[in-house]
């Protein structure tokens, strides 16, 4: 296969990966955790996955501790947790 064909195949596989939603069986367990602002007093606008509403929602993160269900960008939250 030519290098152009391999590049096209790689591009198509990457596109498929980005566009394929996460199924609930593939979703990481931390996506089920509740939002957790943590004890610090920062005001960081971040996102968490709300498993009851099946969507990523914004919340204010204090900047320390909290849990893994915490994303800087909604796209990252959707890619990781949303089905």
Swiss-Prot record:
Disulfide bonds join 31-81, 40-64, 56-77. Keywords: Disulfide bond, Protease inhibitor, Secreted, Serine protease inhibitor, Signal. CDD domains: Kunitz_textilinin-like. Its main location: secreted. SMART domains: KU. The record marks 41-42 as: Reactive bond for trypsin. PROSITE patterns: BPTI_KUNITZ_1, BPTI_KUNITZ_2. Residues 1-24 form the signal peptide. Coiled coil: none annotated. PANTHER family: BPTI_KUNITZ INHIBITOR DOMAIN-CONTAINING PROTEIN, KUNITZ-TYPE PROTEASE INHIBITOR-RELATED. This is Kunitz-type serine protease inhibitor vestiginin-4.
């Amino acid at each position: 296969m030519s290098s152009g064909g391999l590049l096209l195949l790689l591009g198509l596989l990457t596109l498929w990966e980005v566009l394929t939603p996460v199924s609930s069986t593939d979703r990481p367990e931390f996506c089920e955790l509740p939002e957790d602002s943590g004890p610090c007093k920062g005001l960081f606008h971040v996102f968490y996955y709300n498993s009851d509403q099946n969507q990523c929602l914004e919340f204010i993160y204090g900047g320390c501790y909290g849990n893994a269900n915490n994303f800087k960008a909604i796209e990252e939250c959707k890619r990781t947790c949303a089905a």
